[in-house]
A protein has these predicted regions:
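Conserved SGNH/GDSL esterase-like catalytic core that processes O-acyl groups on lipids
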Residues: 27-33, 38-148
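N-terminal secretory targeting modules
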Residues: 1-34, 38-61, 116-117, 167, ...
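Serine-dependent acyl-ester chemistry module
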Residues: 128-152, 180-202
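Second-shell loop/turn segments in exported
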Residues: 37-41, 143-152, 194-195, 244-253
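C-terminal outer-membrane/trafficking sorting elements
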Residues: 280-349
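Generic structural signal for well-ordered alpha-helices
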Residues: 107-111, 158-162, 205
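A short helix->loop->beta-strand "cap" motif at the edges of active sites that frequently abuts
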Residues: 169-173
């Protein structure tokens, strides 16, 4: 854990320091944070509050625990139990669950904080709908209507909610907050034979990428900025369990280190939106055992690490924004390349 923390804080701290030396475009902005229990956190361990405080933003955290996005995530066998489902109206909830309906979790209530004074809406959802997302992924690219408004699908529910946000705040910037791990087997229930059933959170990240492209909104690719995985390419350990002791929430780390790392990563990702060091420029072209980067800020440090955390080689982006780093001369296996803030996993065969 110490090596993970040290490496992550060095990488993120370097970029955050650069950002602090520049003008802060987020200072004074009014931000509404929409999400699940992960951004809701607990008092004293809430990363949206840390992000807002450090960037000088005025925050309204409207994340709600156990909040789904889509009615399609409410399993038929559990439909009698009240669910928090953001895309449902209060009337729809009352019709399904009567007096016990959690109407506070309807978009009609949550979005009351979104108005003409709102500058930014952070949309931090996905994990709770992971099973539905996993089912939808296979057909997304072959379905021309996948992003049509439909509250029974995940993508369609997001389309509905984005539309509702824009009705209330046409000039606000919607930003998708990516999930923090693209390699975690997340529990979704029990099979008929009594064994546990899982889906990989890589699907959540893939859905967020697809949605960002379809909706033309920025995506904070947090999973690239944190080494949080069931099997870390940097350390070989289960860093997910270290980051989330309860297997779901970073705020379950009572030391507060995970929440601080999460906030650092989000600040870093928000900084990328304003400096040009964004996802497309930090994803290299791989050819003949060499990673080729372009569009990086001059002087950006690009480094190659072994899975045990050893630094093998470094290079800096030239005045044209290009950087090249070779890994083909090393033994077959998995390596990690950091480019500024991004973490890219590569395999040398």
């Amino acid at each position: 854990m110490k090596r993970l923390l040290l490496l992550a804080l060095i990488i993120i701290g370097y970029i955050t320091t650069i950002f602090a030396q520049q003008s802060n475009p987020y200072s004074g902005k009014n931000i509404v944070w929409i999400g699940t229990s992960i951004p809701a956190g607990i008092p004293g361990r809430q990363y949206p509050e840390l992000v807002a405080k450090r960037l000088g933003m005025n925050l309204k955290n409207r994340a709600i625990g156990a909040s789904y996005i889509s009615m399609g995530s409410i399993k038929p066998g559990n439909s009698l139990d009240p669910h928090s489902c953001l895309s449902m109206t209060k009337a729809e909830m009352k019709k399904m669950w009567g007096a016990s309906a959690p109407t506070h979790a309807s978009f009609e209530e949550v979005f009351k904080e979104i108005n003409s004074n709102t500058d930014i809406v952070i949309f931090d959802h996905g994990y709770n709908d992971r099973e539905l997302i996993d089912k939808e992924l296979a057909t997304l690219n072959n379905n021309p209507h996948a992003f049509d408004i439909d509250k029974n699908t995940y993508a369609g529910s997001v389309a509905f909610l984005f539309n509702e946000i824009r009705k209330r705040a046409p000039h606000a910037k919607i930003i998708l907050a990516g999930y923090f791990s693209d390699n975690h087997e997340a529990w979704i229930g029990v099979n008929a034979d009594g064994t546990s059933k899982y889906v990989n959170t890589k699907g959540v990240c893939q859905m967020q990428e697809w949605l960002a492209n379809k909706a033309q909104v920025p995506l904070l690719r947090v999973w690239e900025l944190l080494d949080v995985s069931d099997h870390s390419p940097l350390t070989g350990r289960n860093t997910f369990k270290e980051f989330c002791p309860d297997d779901v929430h970073p705020h379950s780390d009572e030391s507060g280190r995970s929440i601080k790392m999460y906030a650092d990563a989000l600040i870093n990702a928000l900084q990328q939106l304003t400096t040009g060091l964004n996802a497309p420029t930090t994803r290299p072209t791989l050819q003949n055992g060499t990673a080729h980067f372009s569009g990086l800020p001059t002087g950006t440090l690009v480094s190659l690490y072994a899975t045990d955390g050893r630094l093998l080689h470094s290079a800096k982006a030239n005045s044209n924004g290009d950087a090249h780093i070779s890994f083909g001369q090393y033994p077959a296996g998995t390596y990690v390349i950091t480019a500024g803030s991004a973490i890219i996993k590569v395999v040398n065969k």
